[in-house]
Amino acid sequence: HFIIRQPSPSHTLGGGLVIDPRPARRWRRFRPETISRLETLSHGTPAEIWLQALSRDEPATVRTVHERSGLADSLAQAAYLEAWQGGDAVLLGAATEPTPEALVISRGGWSQISARLSAILDETHRAYPLRAGMPKGELKSRLDQGRAAPLTPRAFNELLGYAEGAGVLQVSEAAVRRAGHTVTFTPAQQALVKRQLAAFQQQPYTPPSAAQQRYPSGP
C-alpha cells in the first residue's frame, strides 16, 4: 500500500495499492487482458499469481518465477506444486522434479510457442522445399522476435527437446525441420537428378562440369 501526503499543511492527497512492483514490460490500460492480469494479481489464488508471474517471460527457472511472484518462499513453492501437478506448468529439459533451477513453462505459453515453431518451420519448408531443415540460429532469431527478452541458449535448446518429444519437430546437429518433413523432388527435378546420376556413372573419372550439369546438351 502507499499513501501520498502533503507535508505542510498536513493533508492526505490519496493512496492505493501497488499490484505489481516489478513489471517486466509496459501494459496498455483498459485492455481486457491487462485488467484480467491485475485482477488475478490482486485477488487470485497463490497458484494463479504464480502462473501470472511465469507468463511475464517464459520459459523461466522455478527460482526466477518464485522471485517474480512476490509470494513467500513456502507459499510460492506450494503454488508451483499446485500448478505443476494440475498440468498448468510444464518442466522442460531432463528435469523430473521441480528444483529451483529447473526450467518451466505454462501450458498456455507452450501452446503459443509450439504454434509459432510450427508456423515458422512450415513457412520455411514452403519457401525452400529442397532444404532438409532450418538452421538453428535462424530459427532462434525468428522465435525471439516480439519477445520481451531473447531466449537463452539453454531455454531454446530445452524447448526444442520438448517440442521434439511432443512430435512437433525433429532436430539434427545443425538444423530443425517439421516432424515428418522430407525433401521431395518435382517430376522435372527428379528427371534432372536421374540424368545427372547417369552422367556420373558413364564418366566416373571425368564427371560433367557444373555448366554441363545445368545444361546437359552443352551451354
Regions found by a protein language model. Name each.
Residues 1-219:
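C-terminal effector modules of nucleic-acid-centric enzymes and ribosome-associated factors
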